[in-house]
Structures are given as C-alpha cells and as structure tokens.
C-alpha cells in the first residue's frame, strides 16, 4: 500500500507499505516547475541538506546517527517528470518488527531534522558546503557526459 501525504503546498511524503520486504522506505519530495533559472539550485538542495543539521553538523555525525538506527540510509532524490522537477530525500531502514524497536519513527524524525533545521551560518546554508556540493554536482554531470553508454541511456529515456 502506498500512502502519499501533502505536508505543505507542493511538498509530499510518500510511504510504501508491503510485507514483501524487511525494510521500510519513504521519500519526501518537493515538486517545482522546471525552470532554467531554478533547476540547478533545486538539484543542489537535497545534497546540501544531507551535509548536516543543527544537532548533527557533519557527514560523520550523520553516518553515526544512521548506524544507531540499525544501518538506515538517506539519499538525495532529483528527478524530472515532464515539466516538473522533483527533488527531495529518500530513506530506508529495517522494519520495526525485525529491529525490535521503533526505527522508522526515529528515522522520520531525523529526516525532519535535516529538512527543517539544516546546518546554517548567519541564517543561510554554509557557503563552503554549497560550493562543495556544486562541484560534486558538476563532476557528476560531467561523468555522465564522459560515459557514452550512460549518456545514450539518458537520450533514450527522453525519446
């Protein structure tokens, strides 16, 4: 069963429930019109959010926190559907019944912390982290252009 909740205008939480797997997963997505002036910044946002929060200020601290959640994982989500850009975070963890504790709710709280209390300096994202993630995004885009088979697959997806 899939549950999709609109938390705020154009902000959705999607949770998939099934007994087929021993893991639980969810995604939190922002839907934005695809605009040339915003696309790169929208694509950058999830990676910057994954660089830390007020309470968990580093990648290392995030990794430690995920380890405490029985090896849960969180990743960036960037997709294009027609003229809509979908960006956000996805997460998965061991189902509570197999973990013997409430891992899912703690993971949901942690993702909320990353989203609503990001690591900032003077009321804005940390400039150094934004620059690093910008370079990472540029390198990832260049690596797709350099890999002819990957580039071909992108072309096929849009035909």
Describe the residue ranges of each PLM region.
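Short, polar/flexible loop-turn hinges at active-site or ligand-entry regions and domain interfaces
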Residues: 52-55, 96-99, 117-126
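N- or domain-start disorder-to-order transition segments that initiate the globular core
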Residues: 1-25
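Acidic/histidine-enriched alpha-helical segments
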Residues: 63, 117-141
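Short, hydrophobic/amphipathic alpha-helical patches that form generic packing surfaces
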Residues: 47, 113-116
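A generic local secondary-structure boundary/capping motif
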Residues: 2, 144-145
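Active-site SXXK
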Residues: 43-50
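M16 family metallopeptidases and their MPP-like homologs
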Residues: 22-35, 40-42, 59-113, 139-142, ...
